[in-house]
């Protein structure tokens, strides 16, 4: 399978989780990654700037109408839902909170699954609510790959547990093993080109 995007949902404990996964990805990592991290509406974005210093690949805040490109990590801006359009660009919404959250993981996952279908990898990491569980279910329904952090290794296990209860998942892994899986799937993409 040639995967075209990875979407990651993370909440409480997310900075530490991202510090474990993203810095291990090599410079030539090709699959674009889009992250919704539950953050406060007034966040200044420092959380991903910390990561940027540790990583080999470029991390940036997603922009309205921006085209999703390989080799990039995009993060949702505070206080906006991040959606993926059919032309593989971002759009923002200030619609109602979903699962008490804006940005919402479910909103990203559901729109991404409609665009990428079976070429999408959905990932749920540590967090303190059930956001992302229904979105991951939608990814599975559209033939995508579902990956969940092992709740036993999560800083807060509620979000991974909710995802596991909502749908059948392909992988339940530690953060280190998730990073290894990403690298392996990206290598498979290169070999299939």
UniProtKB/Swiss-Prot annotation:
May be involved in chemotaxis. One of its GO terms (biological process) is chemotaxis. It is found in: Cytoplasm. The active site is at 11, 38, 131. One of its GO terms (cellular component) is cytoplasm. The gene is cheB2. Residues 1-189 form the CheB-type methylesterase domain. The lineage of its organism: Bacteria, Pseudomonadati, Spirochaetota, Spirochaetia, Leptospirales. Its main location: cytoplasm. Belongs to the CheB family. This is Putative protein-glutamate methylesterase/protein-glutamine glutaminase.
């Amino acid at each position: 399978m040639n995967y075209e995007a990875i979407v990651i949902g993370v909440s409480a404990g997310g900075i530490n989780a991202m510090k474990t996964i993203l810095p291990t990805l090599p410079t030539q990592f090709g699959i674009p990654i889009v992250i919704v991290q539950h953050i406060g509406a007034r966040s200044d974005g420092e959380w991903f700037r910390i990561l940027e210093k540790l990583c080999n690949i470029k991390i940036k805040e997603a922009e309205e109408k921006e085209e999703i490109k390989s080799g990039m990590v995009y993060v949702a801006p505070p206080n906006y839902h991040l959606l993926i359009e059919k032309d593989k660009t971002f759009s923002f919404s200030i619609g109602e909170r979903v699962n008490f959250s804006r940005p919402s993981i479910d909103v990203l996952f559901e729109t991404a699954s409609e665009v990428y279908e079976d070429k999408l990898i959905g990932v749920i990491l540590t967090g303190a609510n059930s956001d992302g569980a229904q979105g991951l279910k939608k990814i599975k329904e559209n033939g995508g790959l579902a990956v969940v952090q092992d709740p036993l290794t999560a800083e807060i296990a509620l979000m991974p547990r909710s995802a596991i209860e909502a749908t059948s998942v392909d992988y339940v892994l530690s953060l280190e093993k998730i990073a290894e899986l990403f690298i392996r799937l990206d290598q498979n993409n290169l070999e299939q080109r």
